[in-house]
Amino acid sequence: MSEIRAQTDTCYGPVDRQVLDKARDVRLLICDVDGVLSDGLIYMGNQGEELKTFNVRDGYGIRCLLTSGIEVAIITGRTANMLVDRCKTLGIAHLYQGQSDKILAFNDLLDKLSLTVGQVAYIGDDLIDWPVMAQVGLSVAVADAHPLLLPRADYVTRIAGGRGAVRELCDLILFSQNKLEHAKGLSI
């Protein structure tokens, strides 16, 4: 017999109250990049340069979190100069690139920001993300994440990575903390 969970209606549809309870405690959102903030595709130019696309809605959600006093960090296994520029544009102060073991960066963030694991949300899309996701208070997988990651996450976004999944999570965090209405009218 399956368990019946209490749900709350949100602009993204019904969400388990347990997820919103966890989101209420979030003081730091950690994002992966490839497959989360981007669609996971890497475009190669004729000169060998790499290009990625980022969703403006995700950027707006991040700015709303930062304006609401919630920290945002990026931990990624790859390294890309364009990511430094994106973080500067959005006001993200915590960028960890080239991290094959994301737990090290995660622990550094906990120490640096004096946070507990229960105050952290992490959004990822692949197995490299699981070690951190298993530690945080709110673990989130994007809709098109690796199939082994989906059942392990506290919440699976309805929107795919690079298409607004981070915005969905930002909105849910703000909604759970009664701050979503304050996000209106901000600009990035």
Where are the model-predicted features located?
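Amphipathic coiled-coil/heptad-repeat helices and related helical stalk/stem segments
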Residues: 15-16, 58, 102
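Asp-based phosphoryl-transfer active-site loop
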Residues: 23-42, 133, 166
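Substrate-recognition element of Asp-dependent hydrolases with the DxDx(T/V) motif
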Residues: 62-86, 96-97, 133
